[in-house]
Amino acid sequence: MKRIFALVLAVAMMLTALTSCGGREKFDMTTVHNLSDLSGATIAAQAGTFHLEALTAQTTGVTIREYSDFTQLLIALNSGVIDGYVAEEPTAYAVIAQNPNLAYIPLQNNVNGFTASDADTGIAVAFQNGSPLVPDVNIVLSRIDAATREALMQQVVRMSANPDVALGENLALTSNGTVTSNITLKIAMECSYAPFNWSQTTDANGAVKIANGDLYANGYDVQIAKYIAAELGVNLEIYAVDWESLISGVQAGTYDGIIAGMSPTAEREAQVDFTDCYYNSNLVIIYKK
């Protein structure tokens, strides 16, 4: 009887181990070096993004999950419901800086990672179809060289680790422009997608008060928005908007533009007009160690 009980107990413990991660066996993400190695894993991506499109179309044998925002993705990963999720490499930097229990697979687009064009993985400013702001903003963006773009990204990644603490250094991207009109540029973003955009409680490191909330917005997108507004000589307002409502808000004229880590995919280009890309990145997979 004792042997039977011991056997039953051992089986029960094994089943508990197998189901401790959301009712499934945890996949060893350290064995992944390219997309084909993901077969058998449960991987997630944000709904309505190229991340999800690529994950669905370019992987086989993968259980795919989708979540509405990156906060939910992080919760799902830490709870063991998923093995990993797709993100831009700068997002991985920021997330891991605040969550040392996480790591990422450094996939390279069109090499060992996702097949993607610059339009797929680049991010651009979106305006209403036919907006005269597109060529003006393209001129502004052309003044930001690649070195400055990367230096700014490295700074905002560090800022995102302690957003309400002053970085103690000048930002890589600044403008000498001043407001020369009473025009206000209304820009929408999630304010929850570090290091591109996030919310914080103070105006540290050049954060901007969120027009429709009590917090402040900061991040790469916010600094780009500030630079554009300053170079155009207009006022700036930042609005916190759910991802799924960004494009419809611009189409309705509620906001002038979107600066939210948004890629100019073909589907979106049919709905809004995009500027040239202001940042390009590899798509990687964040996982729990």
Regions found by a protein language model. Name each.
Residues 1-8:
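Positively charged n-region of N-terminal signal peptides that target proteins for export
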Residues 37, 42-47, 51, 57-58, ...:
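Extracytoplasmic small-molecule ligand-binding "clamshell" domains
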